[in-house]
Amino acid sequence: MTQMTDAKSGITTEEMKFVAKEEGMDVETFKNLIAKGYVVIPKNVNRNTKPVGIGDNLRTKVNVNLGTSPDFIDIACELKKVEISNKYGADAIMDLSTGGNLPEIRKEIIKNTNLPIGTVPIYEVGADAKAKYGRVIDMDEDLIFNVIERQAKEGVDFMTLHCGITKQTVSALNNDPRKMGVVSRGGAFLTAYIMYHDKENPLYKEFDYLLELLKEHDVTLSLGDGMRPGCLQDNTDRAQIQELITLGELVDKCREKGVQVMVEGPGHVPYNNIEANMKIQKTLCKNAPFYVLGPIVTDLAPGYDHITAAIGGTLAAVSGANFLCYVTPAEHVRLMKEDDVKEGLIASKIAAQAADVAKGHSIAWKLEKEMADARMKHDWEKQFEIALDSDKPGKMREEIPSKDEKACSVCGDYCALLMVEELGKR
């Protein structure tokens, strides 16, 4: 049984009750969204995961990517990133490790959080194929599905799988060449496999078998966008849309089988094209939850891509995206460090909150009203408690204090709020 099959059968699970309460929603209404596939709860049956809802009519959620690379392998560092994710309000974590003992790293990450954990299994497949055969492109079907099954048994809650990379998608790419080609690692692995062997993508060819594996453990399928644009010039081209059409067809199959599914979206999109991209996805994929990387709205800001992504992410979430994958200042430059994780997470949470306010979500507005009340009362402790980052503003206030404990050092004696407040007392 999965959350979706239960919902279709009229069964209300404890996870549904928990998430509905968190979202301030009637549980029957929420259950109906699960049954239709408009909302997912990524929660493997083999793991005691905190239930988190992702999808329409819910608060916008934020994911943190972390993990090793062949150039930097330090489990302690990754666990510190997990700690930061837990502390500053991530809704999910993806382990994208590609260096070191991948099962051991994943095991430690899972052990140190109760947040939903996602992976991209093709990374481990590629590492295993390289170790066994010497080349990533020599991976085979057995290796692919063995890794997926093993990770499902370990408790992974959702998996990015690039099932929409097909011979037809690769043909669309070849017929409409891009500036930057394929920038998705998983997408590149499978594109290279198709081109070298002249074989169909096993994840697409054996999709029914894949669904059986995922359904057994109630792993949520996150349909990866292997043809996402890697620069603004490549946005919304034929390869991207061809893959999205295929993903829409696969969403239908997932729902028929009772497998929870969400769809991943583009990374580099001009601001004026973001709304159209969200509407295309929601239409082709029949309102499946949409999970976007950014989108990044300019390619000119390496070192500041947490900002470019927050700008794009806000509009994306207002226009239909449900799940924002954070982007850190290290994007396009190097592996993220601990401080990068915090900055990227806070930036994405700002985007999510701004979007939820724009959509009129009651919980988002409740927080905004509480902050306004705290500011009006000069209650600095309450302000910092409500803030998305409770640590930074307190430290900043201590750096340049005001003589008046109610005011801040920008205005001091000339504080507008205090001035009008004093006049009101006379």
From Swiss-Prot:
HAMAP family, alphabetized: ThiC (MF_00089)
Cofactor: how and how many bound: Binds 1 [4Fe-4S] cluster per subunit. The cluster is coordinated with 3 cysteines and an exchangeable S-adenosyl-L-methionine.
Pathway: Cofactor biosynthesis; thiamine diphosphate biosynthesis
Biological classification of the source: Archaea, Methanobacteriati, Methanobacteriota, Methanomada group, Methanococci
Binding annotation for [4Fe-4S] cluster: 408, 411, 415
Gene Ontology terms for molecular function: 4 iron, 4 sulfur cluster binding; carbon-carbon lyase activity; zinc ion binding
Pfam families: ThiC_Rad_SAM (PF01964)
Necessary cofactors: [4Fe-4S] cluster
Alphabetical GO biological process terms: thiamine biosynthetic process; thiamine diphosphate biosynthetic process
Protein name per Swiss-Prot or TrEMBL: Phosphomethylpyrimidine synthase
Keyword terms: 4Fe-4S, Iron, Iron-sulfur, Lyase, Metal-binding, S-adenosyl-L-methionine, Thiamine biosynthesis, Zinc
Residues noted as binding Zn(2+) in the record, renumbered to the chain: 268, 332
Catalyzed reactions: 5-amino-1-(5-phospho-beta-D-ribosyl)imidazole + S-adenosyl-L-methionine = 4-amino-2-methyl-5-(phosphooxymethyl)pyrimidine + CO + 5'-deoxyadenosine + formate + L-methionine + 3 H(+)
Family the UniProt entry places it in: Belongs to the ThiC family.
Organism in which the protein naturally occurs: Methanococcus maripaludis (strain C5 / ATCC BAA-1333)
Annotated EC: 4.1.99.17
Function: Catalyzes the synthesis of the hydroxymethylpyrimidine phosphate (HMP-P) moiety of thiamine from aminoimidazole ribotide (AIR) in a radical S-adenosyl-L-methionine (SAM)-dependent reaction.
UniProt: substrate binding residues: 65, 94, 123, 162, 184-186, 225-228, 264, 291
